[in-house]
Swiss-Prot record:
Gene behind this protein: rps13
SUPFAM superfamilies in alphabetical order: S13-like H2TH domain
GO cellular component: cytosol; small ribosomal subunit
Protein role: Located at the top of the head of the 30S subunit, it contacts several helices of the 16S rRNA. In the 70S ribosome it contacts the 23S rRNA (bridge B1a) and protein L5 of the 50S subunit (bridge B1b), connecting the 2 subunits; these bridges are implicated in subunit movement.
Organism of provenance: Haloquadratum walsbyi (strain DSM 16790 / HBSQ001)
GO MF, one example: rRNA binding
Keyword RNA-binding recorded: yes
Name of this protein: Small ribosomal subunit protein uS13
Transmembrane segments: none
Region (Disordered), start-end ranges: 130-155
Oligomeric and partner information: Part of the 30S ribosomal subunit. Forms a loose heterodimer with protein S19. Forms two bridges to the 50S subunit in the 70S ribosome.
Amino acid sequence: MSTNNTQDDAAEEEDDDLQYFVRIGTTDLDGTKAVERSLTDMKGIGKRTARIITDVASVDRHATFGLLEEDEIDSITDAVENLDDHIPGWMTNRREDFFSGDTDHKTGADLEEKRRHDVNRMKMIDSYKGVRHKRGQKVRGQRTKSTGRTEGTIGVNVEAIKEEAAEAAEEEE
């Protein structure tokens, strides 16, 4: 019975130390998941990139994110912010930026902003992809004849027919 109590006490202490949300950059990450898994919730970071980040930060990737010490979280934050220094150029998501020519790895809101800026630039210069974006059509050569139809189907609405028949029957009476 006493071993059960010590296990319960240890579990309660872990719950007290657990941070349910860990903030990295502008993103709140789940503190109840493993470090590697939680990092993949951030835009611009996948499984492979998360593994590299944990290796660079010297943190156990299977550890619960919310139970890490402040210095470990700071090392992960530094690894995310300086990720382009630790990965090869072909692995970054901003290779040879159009304006600056730099190779960089963007994450979170910065990545969304850059993508939106790129799409707007394509629309402004009326490139083929920009025109497709303007029209709301598929951009990467997918078929459009039969797939991707967002409009509702033009079929028979049985309920509407029944309602019209009921209204017509009431009018006749």
